[in-house]
Amino acid sequence: MRITGTEWEKGGINENEAIIFAQELERIGCHYVCVSSGGNTPNPKIPIKPHYQVHLAKTIKENTNMIVRAVGMISDPKKANDIIISQEADMVAMARAFLSNPRWVWDAAKILNHDIKVPPQYARRL
């Protein structure tokens, strides 16, 4: 389920309320949340920058036992890997990264020094 970690504005959902909501979701059987933010109040002051929502996922992960996915301008393979390794989140979502670079997975594998096996039909494009 996708939840809001904060609305970035007074009167909207804040981080403490997001924790309570996530804990209630877990209590009734939810096993996974994707933590986003903003978009439900009229004038949020969203600090848009790379990884700006990762701390929200980390907060939910620290306060539940659910699988948590982080979002928020995650495009750098090393940072995406660091988010997982540091247990800030269990998964990362990178929609815009894939839209701007359909070869993101291959490029990330090279950057992170992962040897991946590919069918011969695709190898010529790497």
Where is each model-derived feature located?
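Flavin-dependent oxidoreductase catalytic cores
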Residues: 1-126
